[in-house]
């Protein structure tokens, strides 16, 4: 058994992480930290976690654990690392964006960095959009087939914005609504480009990324296309070969939709040749494969557990 601690456990990703850890057979939760919820029972804040009614949020717990997860929001993890000394031998998995381009952290996309994650002490968990998009493109990059501009439209649920209230997270604004934000300038683009260059060093194509807010709570659907002369048969071979030993990325001929993946750590991908273009659809749960589930997947690899330990989850389906 390993002892785990969660910093920033009062929000959406922190709460989802506690849900996974509470049922993980190889884990004991050592502490749950939250400045805003300090002194409250975890079950009083995350009211489905009845079994954690005796675990209380602490504002400043001693960092005594085998691994610490940082779920603090973007820009806050680096401050935490500056102000706190993580003891030697304590591993760290950051779910924010602070260290995704930092060479002192291993980028935690198992489908890209599987073996490096196994020996890592510090992991930077990928972004949710970045995960969905990379899993659609990695087989092409590995075979140096990304040679034209890439067009991406992707929509995310409201939990992707976090728990803090804002104008665009109010129910009355989000419900029955859809909107574009950060067109061509989303913060996940640099980490996507870096990963593609890791496999295809000469990659220098434009990523035309249009992110969208949806009126649902969970899930990401990414629709991606670019010109390519690769045949459908070769596309099928590329994807089946790349993902044959990856337990959470599923390649399908069916039309992917969110109900296939919500409440799971799976990413479902379809690839089709459409005239002169290749079209890829990628779907995942932004709180699981896009955040907390992938963090647990990384933890499993770091400690030598089966990759799917504690992550055999069922989709909502309907």
Predicted features and spans:
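Short Gly/Pro-enriched turn/cap motifs at secondary-structure boundaries
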Residues: 180-184, 212, 257-261
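C-terminal substrate-binding/catalytic lobe of Rossmann-fold NAD(P)-dependent dehydrogenases
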Residues: 185-251
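Electropositive phosphate-/nucleotide-binding environments in soluble metabolic enzymes
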Residues: 11, 74, 130-131, 182-190, ...
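C-terminal active-site/capping subdomain that shapes the small-molecule cofactor and substrate pocket
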Residues: 225-318
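N-terminal Rossmann-like NAD(P) cofactor-binding subdomain of oxidoreductases
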Residues: 1-183, 202, 272-274, 317
């Amino acid at each position: 058994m390993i002892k785990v601690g969660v910093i920033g456990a009062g929000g959406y990703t922190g709460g989802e992480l506690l849900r996974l850890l509470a049922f993980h057979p190889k884990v004991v939760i050592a502490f749950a930290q939250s400045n805003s919820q300090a002194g409250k029972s975890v079950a009083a804040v995350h009211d489905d976690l009845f079994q954690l009614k005796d675990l209380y949020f602490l504002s400043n717990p001693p960092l005594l654990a085998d691994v610490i997860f940082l779920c603090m929001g973007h820009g806050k993890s680096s401050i935490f690392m500056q102000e706190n000394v993580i003891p030697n031998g304590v591993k760290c998995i950051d779910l924010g964006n602070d260290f995704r381009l930092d060479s002192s952290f291993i980028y935690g996309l198992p489908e890209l960095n599987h073996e490096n994650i196994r020996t890592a002490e510090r992991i930077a968990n990928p972004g949710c959009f970045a995960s969905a998009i990379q899993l659609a493109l990695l087989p092409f990059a590995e075979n140096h087939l990304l040679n034209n501009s890439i067009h991406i439209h992707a929509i995310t649920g409201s939990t992707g914005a976090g728990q803090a209230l804002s104008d665009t997270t109010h129910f009355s604004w989000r419900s029955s609504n859809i909107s574009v934000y950060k067109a061509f300038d989303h913060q996940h683009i640099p980490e996507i480009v870096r990963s593609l260059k890791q496999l295809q060093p000469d990659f220098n194509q434009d990523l035309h990324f249009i992110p969208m807010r949806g009126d649902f709570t969970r899930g990401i659907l990414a629709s991606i296309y670019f010109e390519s002369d690769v045949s459908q048969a070769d596309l099928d071979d590329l994807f089946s070969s790349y993902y044959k030993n990856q337990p959470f990325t599923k390649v399908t001929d069916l039309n992917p939709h969110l109900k296939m993946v919500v409440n799971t750590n799976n990413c479902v991908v379809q690839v089709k040749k459409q005239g002169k273009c290749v079209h890829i659809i990628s779907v995942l749960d932004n709180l699981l494969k896009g955040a907390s589930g992938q963090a647990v997947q990384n933890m499993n690899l770091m400690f030598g557990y089966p990759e799917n330990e504690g992550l055999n989850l069922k989709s909502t389906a309907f």
